[in-house]
Amino acid sequence: MPPKKKKITAIIKLQINAGKATPAPPVGPALGQHGVNIMEFCKQYNAATESQAGNVVPVEITVYEDRSFTFVTKTPPAARLILKAAGVEKGSGTPHRDKVAKLTPAQVREIAQTKLPDLNATTIEAAEKIIAGTARSMGITVGD
């Protein structure tokens, strides 16, 4: 007889700095209300993301009926990667009027390759268009 599948009670999505998960908010309250061992999650998450230090890494935590959990880390948000590549602190308040930085097509391609597994795109060209659109909506121009 095959083993029984665990019943899922919750799926929690968080964005946490890589290698810096602590039981303090926002991690503690989000996991605590589902009865998850918070310290155990923090240790596992920090070990899994220590190589990406300095980035915000989204994580999807699946909580099961017996209070056990599994998690999947995603790629950093496109907006964060764009800001880092452009070397600016934040995007423009009025993106269509004020431009704050410029990205080269090579930088856009690099970000698109990083984000491809999490994007709704099958080709690198489609991923580049998505990243370029995100950059434009932040007041960052794309071109040579």
Swiss-Prot record:
InterPro entries: Ribosomal_uL11, Ribosomal_uL11_bac-typ, Ribosomal_uL11_C, Ribosomal_uL11_C_sf, Ribosomal_uL11_CS, Ribosomal_uL11_N, Ribosomal_uL11_N_sf. SUPFAM superfamilies: Ribosomal L11/L12e N-terminal domain, Ribosomal protein L11, C-terminal domain. Keywords: Methylation, Ribonucleoprotein, Ribosomal protein, RNA-binding, rRNA-binding. The keyword Cytoplasm does not apply. GO terms for molecular function: large ribosomal subunit rRNA binding; structural constituent of ribosome. One or more lysine residues are methylated. One of its GO terms (biological process) is translation. GO terms for cellular component: cytosolic large ribosomal subunit. It comes from the Bacteria. Belongs to the universal ribosomal protein uL11 family. Forms part of the ribosomal stalk which helps the ribosome interact with GTP-bound translation factors. Part of the ribosomal stalk of the 50S ribosomal subunit. Interacts with L10 and the large rRNA to form the base of the stalk. L10 forms an elongated spine to which L12 dimers bind in a sequential fashion forming a multimeric L10(L12)X complex. This is Large ribosomal subunit protein uL11. The lineage of its organism: Bacteria, Bacillati, Actinomycetota, Actinomycetes, Frankiales.
